[in-house]
């Protein structure tokens, strides 16, 4: 599945495939994809939501759907791209893709719903206005 969608995703993170990520069949085990997607989520939040305090806030995944289109081999050069496709009051929906850097082939796609959580108050909270605006500006959400 090859798509020209690069320009729709501003946040792109190259991924390193580790020795233990590859099974005896020579491909990356599908459980590892979730770790790759987490790397993209972490970079996205740190890049877009300036001043995000990981000791004060958490972001919980409340729903996740992953589609697998093609195997990732141990020698592949891959990256994950991330964008917000919907911004609610206390939650947001991310779309992510793992793709081959050389061919642009999309290997997997992930849709997830995440909730902002205040660790001190022990409850979900609304996004601060500055982060809400930063996400809108970064991903072109109206």
Region locations from a protein language model:
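Residue-level recognition of specific faces of alpha-helices
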Residues: 33-36, 60, 113
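HotDog/MaoC-like acyl-thioester-processing domains
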Residues: 2-13, 68, 73-74, 85-142
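Catalytic strand-loop segment that frames the active site of acyl-thioester-processing enzymes
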Residues: 1-43
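Hydrophobic beta-strand-centered segment that forms part of the acyl-chain substrate-binding groove
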Residues: 44-92, 107
